[in-house]
Every structure is written in structure tokens, then in C-alpha cells.
Amino acid sequence: MSHPLFDISGRRALVTGSSRGIGFALARGLLEAGCTVVLNGRDAGRLTKAASELPGDVHTAVFDVTDGPSVAAGIADVEDRVGPIDILVNNAGMQLRAPLLEFTDTDWHRILNTNLTSAFLVGREAARRMTERGHGKIVNICSLQSEVVRPGIAPYAATKGALKMLTKGMCADWGQYGVQVNGLGPGYIETELTQPLVEDEEFSAWVRRRTPAGRWGRTEDLVGGVLFLASPAADFVSGQVLYVDGGMTSVL
């Protein structure tokens, strides 16, 4: 028998950027835990395909998480069609690798909007309703790079470091209304988008050497952390980032 502290069956969860990769795996985990899940992205066809591959009560919501009016309309539509959002996972994100001296203004604003502004916009709209109802869980997908950085990814690390502090700020503002806001910080995770790095033997050897667990992470490694942070077991946990990185942030 499962412990009631970890029971989230019947809750409604919105996962942004969930047509593939980490977001898709987190959506699957929430569905398997008994949640109703709404997948989000900008490509309707890709979302429909993703939904067809998942079990349980799954819905889709096409809206641009970097555009305020689109987010406001999207959240309202989700609550009208599916019901009140109990759990929000701000997963939408991107990576652009380039030395800082070569990083363009356009790419800077693009990565900032995708990784940080989206969490602010979607989090704010969801929290308007959560705070009125007196409960809610928000999980922002941060990163190992919220704490440390390698050459060539400074803008990405800047957005993820800022997302860590936005998480703490959301906690400070909304905690009094029964809303817990936490972060999940993946380490190096094998996905479709990281496959070129996985196949780079020199880089993969570095990852294995630097990670006490001795391997790349898998998307399913992240599910347990999200299920915990979304559950009643985490009702007195807020403003924290749970790093799921095989121990990388703990060693030199």
C-alpha cells in the first residue's frame, strides 16, 4: 500500500514543453501516479502524437509560453476544459552553445525568454488561481548549471541561475497562500537533444568521470523528484532546488 503522503491521484497537472525529452518523461510519471495531465507546446501535431503515446487521462494545450497574452489565454482555456490546475511543471527550455564573445543579442533574448520569462509568465498565471484556491504546487525545472558552469554555456547558466532565484521569490510571495514552489535540477541527462554530446566519447568520458554515479542520467531518474515535490509529502518544502545529478554538484 502506498503512503497517503505521496498520493497525488486525481490531481491536475500542466507540464510545459512536454512533447518530448524530460517534459514527456515527467508527464508520463505524473500520469502513472494517477494525475490528469495537460501537455503543452507550440506544435499541435507533435503534442497530439505525444499524447497518443501516453496512458491515462491526457490533454493538450497549444500556446506560446514566452508570450504573456498567449499564456493568459492558454491557462484560462486549460482550466475551462480540464479543471483547476493543482500542479504546474515549468519545463520549457532550450540550450544554445557559443562563446560569450560570439553570442548574439538575438540569441540572448531567445534563451532568456524560453528558459526564464516563460516560467515567470506561466507561473504567475497559474498562481493567480492557485492562491485564490489556497493550494498549489509549482516545480520549476532548473539545472546543474543553476550552480556551476562550463565554457560556452554562460547564457544558459545565467538563465538557470536566475530561475533558481525566481523559484525562491515565488516561494516568498505565494507561500502564505498555500502554494509551494520548488525547483528540480537535472544533471547531465540523456535525451534526444543531448544525443550528440552522449555520442561524443571525450565528453561522455568527462561526464562519467565527474559524476559519482558514473553515468549519464536518464529521464526516468527525474520522475521521483517531481512526484515528491508535487505531493502532500512536500507541503512544508518550498523555495528549494532538488538536484538530481548523480552527485555531480557535490564533488570537485
Residues of each region from the PLM?
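Residue(s) in the substrate-gating loop at a strand-loop-helix junction
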Residues: 143
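Short C-terminal tail/terminal secondary-structure segment
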Residues: 2-4, 148, 227, 238-252
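Active-site helix of classical SDR
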Residues: 123, 159, 167
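Substrate-binding pocket helix/loop in short-chain dehydrogenase/reductase
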Residues: 99-100, 107-112, 138, 203, ...
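Alpha-helical segment proximal to the catalytic Tyr-Lys
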Residues: 128, 172-173, 235
